[in-house]
Amino acid sequence: WRETAKEYNYHLSNDKLKLLKGRRRIDCAKKVFQWINKEISIEELLRIQKIKVNNQIVLAKPFTGAIDLIKFCINIKLPIALVTSSSSDSFKIKSSANPWLNLFKIKILGDNKFITSGKPSPDPYLKAIEILNINPKKTWVIEDSYAGSISGLKAKCNLLFFSKDIQVLNKLTQEFNQNNIQKINEL
């Protein structure tokens, strides 16, 4: 989004970028649209952002140990799901470069027609919990963004916060029961 904003001579600060992390593209576009405050359309922002991000998406790689963790969960028959803000189109691009993403049998994507709001709303995780038919209090979400963490915690799940962003971690522990939040740097 920083590169997209530059097209309109607008600099997105790190704090503003953090606010976008983990959210659906359409929700990010609406925020950036407000900040830029130029005579453009949200559709134009989305078009430019898609061009810029498609070149970067294929470079995304999993966190160290992520694939092993997914395979372990599958092998012991632990119910798992992928809950992402990525749209179906974006997920196709990501999973073509990262086929391990297809290990997840259950995927809740950002444009899922059965969720009304994306992260930080609890809707995406509530949908996954419903499909998996599990107790959210016995569920762990692994997140690296504030929006995703809020989404999981509001759905009454426990959180493994996978980030070195201490400010976000501190904010989360102030807003929610710290017993439900664990911080990890590496899997």
Task: Please state what every model-predicted region is.
Residues 19-54, 72:
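A metal-dependent, Asp-based hydrolase signature
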Residues 59, 87-140, 146, 150, ...:
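Substrate-recognition "cap/lid" segment bordering the active-site pocket of phosphatases
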Residues 99-111, 170-187:
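Structural recognition of alpha->loop->beta junctions
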Residues 4, 72, 151:
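Hydrophobic/aromatic ligand-binding patch that stacks against planar heteroaromatic rings
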Residues 137-181:
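Acidic, Mg2+-coordinating phosphoryl-transfer loop and its flanking beta/alpha structural elements
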